[in-house]
Swiss-Prot record:
The protein, known as: 3-dehydroquinate synthase
Cofactor binding note of this UniProt entry: Binds 1 divalent metal cation per subunit. Can use either Co(2+) or Zn(2+).
Cofactor or coenzyme needed: Co(2+); Zn(2+); NAD(+)
Gene: aroB
Species this protein is from: Exiguobacterium sp. (strain ATCC BAA-1283 / AT1b)
Function text: Catalyzes the conversion of 3-deoxy-D-arabino-heptulosonate 7-phosphate (DAHP) to dehydroquinate (DHQ).
Record Gene3D superfamilies: 3.40.50.1970, Dehydroquinate synthase-like - alpha domain
Amino acid sequence: MVTIPISASTPYDVVLDNQDRWIDSVDWSRYSMLWVVTDKHVESLYGESFRSTLKLTHPHVVSSVVEAGDASKSLSQLEQLVAEGLRHGCDRETLIVAFGGGMIGDLAGFLASVYMRGVPYIQVPTTILAHDSAVGGKVAVNHPLAKNAIGSFYQPSGVYYNVTRLNTLSVQEVRSGLGELLKHAYLSRYVLESSFEDDLFLDLNENEPLDWVSWLARGIRVKQAIVETDEREQGIRAWLNFGHTFGHALESVEAYRIPHGEAVLHGMVFAFLVSGDEVRAMRLFDWMRSNDVTPIDWQPFDRYVEKMIRDKKNRHGAIRFVLLRETITVESVQLEHLQQTFEQMKGWWER
């Protein structure tokens, strides 16, 4: 078991384990009710057993189940959850339990931030990808025009991983999770004393068991170093958006056919090409191809620009990218250069 304390406006622990020992460490008597929010996929795998375990610690456990997939990160779904909470009798002493992947963490976390002007919540992630979104307190839903356009900063009371639940992830979900983990690996050389960038180019076709407690802890420590310095993204927290400018645009243009972490992988190749680092771009591209990352259904360049101009990092109408040079920079990039990069990357995939 690994415990990583996060210093924030509301401090909390991230616990990584191969079982649910964390349950015995929570003071459940503080809460009038436990409200589990999950999706249909996680519900089918773990919902009943997880709620049964919680019922051993608290007499009042209710649940809400939404459709799996990013389409559930919406205002309409949020409104439905508020209605369910009111029907359940959830009050301001209710604890929301976000039980699922990154979509559930974002949705349930934002629900916690607005339900009755704010109730506590914990994250119980079930995916590799969620090691990023579960830490740091960013919660949001999507708008049809932009991803994560409606949200807030709202820290959880704890983040609790049982990594045995990762055993049921598909190969695509593992690839997607490695997208965010690779992002943290690239950032590690700038924020930690040692880099683990070279360690993560794994052959996913080998089916060898991985020590996920150790791997996730390494990624979370990178995020810890950044968010403890800049909790509300006034400075270096923007570094965590490496790969996300083009990645988010790609997700939106593809109507979320490409999972978030795979979109970030594409976005990091794009960002490396923007900065002129073809060596790292090609190494990542080759790894993506050898591990069958979902290819892009290329659309006209303007479709992606329409999405990138709504990115939250932008200033005064200029599209900005997080770029990894000798230091990490956040730079405005001209449309002409972005189009050249787009055509270069498209050419790599089409050859």
